[in-house]
Amino acid sequence: LTSHLDEFIDLAETYLKRAPVPADSPDIGGVRGNIQRSTGNLISGTSTLALPNDFLEIYRLTFTGDTFSTLRYVAPNQLALNHRSGTGRPSFFTISDVIEFDIAPDSTYAYELSYYPSATALSDSNTSNFILATFPDVYLAACLFHAFRFLQDEQSAANWLAQYKQESWSASETYRLPRVSQGS
């Protein structure tokens, strides 16, 4: 069984990298981490922006230069309806394998992309990540689910899956809670 441990970890990480879903959902969700921020400048005439390697889910995209503004996310099919030809100041964006804008920028715009990261996979050179460091029970439950499936012990696998779903949702909720005290 121990010879398959790396496989169980790899399989667990496929779950951990998914978007979170409530514990009572029929789907199996992942764990959302603390919001990360990436800054840069949009390139004039280029209507796309590469996603960070650890991107899981968008939180906000803002222009941070002289005129601070938040761009509005729209579904991919809606971006086609909002598409403008030529160049200008983008107002809308969507996400595919890149961030796509409704219009190519007419200038260089400073931006801040706020997003939820996915967990970095464990390896010989990367022995920890934010989930393992903060929520080791989530890793354990996901790995044991796959181990018991491998052993064809469906009852134990179901128990560990239920625990994983509860723990992963709880871990994700930790990052959704307000960070500001409302006083006593």
Where are these regions (language model features)?
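Glycine-enriched, solvent-exposed interface loops adjoining structured elements
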Residues: 1-184
